[in-house]
């Protein structure tokens, strides 16, 4: 509801009325590719490979998004953009693997079949996440980010909430199972994170995808592991070793290539 309120305050009812069947279709597909199939596939991949490995593989999705943009949107992808995309992806994947090694996370104990299945699921996740960025680009043109996210979150909440309720009715929780909903004080602790990530972050994401070529916007939007490094260092949880520094340099070099392309 917050998205629609801000949309009406900033653009009136006309901003919401700009939704067309074309945009609704593409934005619905983006929900399927992200909150629907994409996140579900990632969950099952992480169960088989471990979260860091699954995330590293899924993080190649900017390559697919760049390909989609070049083939269907006529975006020009020169050598410098392609190099920048590959450097960003390589740097992010390297950082994720370094984080996994530092924490001792490994999927070696899993059977070979489970690891292969996890690999395929992680690759499918990368395609779904690329489909999300592509769908937002196709469906979000001409709309404000608040309208785009208002529709996406409303649809996702309705569908996922209904599925959860059906499952809850079929399989009621036992007396010793943890409750889904937290107390009011616990919920209030999440308010800053919700406003920062779900509202501000997702609005910036939509604006970037609809105002910049996918070959530039998608790699730059996928660099959260890079920004996690200084946070980890400041909190004293992660040392800055040579390998991590090299991974940062590779990622930043990719950013420079994309920005100056």
Regions found by a protein language model. Name each.
Residues 1, 25, 29, 60, ...:
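Hydrophobic residues within alpha-helical transmembrane segments
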Residues 1, 13, 128-158, 215-216:
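Juxtamembrane helix-loop-helix junctions in multi-pass membrane proteins
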Residues 1-29, 39-49, 97-120, 157-193, ...:
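Membrane-interface interhelical linkers
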Residues 1-5, 57-71, 155-159, 220-234, ...:
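Alpha-helical transmembrane segments of compact multi-pass small-molecule transporters, enriched
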Residues 4, 31-36, 62-67, 130, ...:
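Hydrophobic/small/kink-forming positions within alpha-helical transmembrane segments
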Residues 21, 58, 74-94, 98-104, ...:
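Loop-to-transmembrane alpha-helix entry segments
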Residues 40-57, 141-147, 203-223:
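Structural motif at transmembrane-helix junctions in multi-pass transporters
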Residues 45, 71-77, 139, 148, ...:
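Hydrophobic/aromatic residues within transmembrane alpha-helices
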């Amino acid at each position: 509801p917050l998205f629609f309120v801000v949309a009406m305050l900033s653009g009136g009812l006309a901003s919401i009325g700009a939704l067309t069947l074309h945009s609704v279709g593409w934005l619905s597909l983006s929900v399927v590719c992200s909150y629907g199939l994409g996140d579900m596939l990632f969950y099952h991949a992480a169960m088989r490979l471990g979260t860091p490995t699954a995330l590293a593989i899924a993080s190649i999705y900017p390559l697919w998004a760049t390909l989609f943009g070049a083939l269907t949107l006529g975006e020009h992808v020169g050598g410098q953009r392609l190099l920048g995309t590959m450097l960003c992806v390589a740097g992010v994947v390297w950082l994720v693997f370094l984080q996994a090694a530092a924490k001792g996370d490994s999927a070696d104990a899993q059977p070979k079949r489970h690891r292969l299945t996890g690999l395929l699921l992680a690759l499918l996740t990368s395609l779904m996440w690329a489909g999300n960025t592509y769908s937002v680009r196709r469906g979000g043109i001409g709309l404000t980010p608040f309208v785009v996210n208002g529709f996406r979150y409303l649809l996702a909440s309705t569908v996922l909430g209904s599925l959860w309720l059906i499952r809850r009715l079929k399989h009621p929780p036992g007396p010793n199972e943890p409750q889904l909903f937290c107390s009011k004080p616990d919920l209030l602790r999440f308010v800053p994170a919700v406003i920062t990530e779900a509202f501000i972050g997702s609005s910036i994401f939509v604006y970037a995808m609809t105002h910049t070529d996918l070959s530039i916007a998608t790699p730059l939007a996928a660099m959260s592991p890079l920004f996690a490094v200084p946070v980890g260092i400041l909190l004293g949880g992660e040392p800055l070793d040579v390998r991590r520094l090299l991974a940062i340099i590779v990622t930043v070099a990719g950013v420079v290539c994309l920005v100056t392309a």
